């Protein structure tokens, strides 16, 4: 059964609020990126709210939490609350989708922007205790050689905020963990969250999203049960058919027919029939 928080209990570390705050407050989103990445950003734009990228027919699409651009960089910010062993593969897939979305037909590869895939996790995905894991492609034979493909993946482990030396990052990670603002920026985040909660239209939006998700969950559960029943029936038929072939082969063996002819008659392999004679 799916569980949804009450609207009044939502925090910045819940997906609805996380996306709402960063989508509707461009200055806050830009400041967050600058704090996490330690870079200066001129401005950001939102290519599409709740961007879904699916470049090929029947390919797996991806819905990005927060997808923004500046003049020569693209950023995907993902909030991850639940344990997930697939984060490394998800970063690879998200990266490929960003590239497909940002290189038009006829453009040169040199026009690809620098991309950042950022995961903010409420757990340590690699169990090494680091507050930040940064990945870039390097040469195994010469670690000093960076591939320079302008692809950077940063995974933040909020549970290790106490050992993060950068005070801005530490304060943000702590806020993700316990929702207690400890600096001006997290105070601003907390204030925006409370303002969002005061508007009834946001509450209705959140509730309608939950109804949609709950319907999808129930539909998927029903389809899964039906598929399981169908597979069980097919498996039973298959097993029954196999057993019938074996019984037929046993009867034919008592009639002194050749193993080759029995194999042709039943569809069993010669090896299977030889096993019945032992």
Regions found by a protein language model. Give the residues of each.
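Conserved single-residue anchors adjacent to enzymatic active/cofactor-binding motifs
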Residues: 1-204
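Short, charged alpha-helical interaction segments and adjacent helix-coil junctions
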Residues: 1-6, 71-80, 166-278
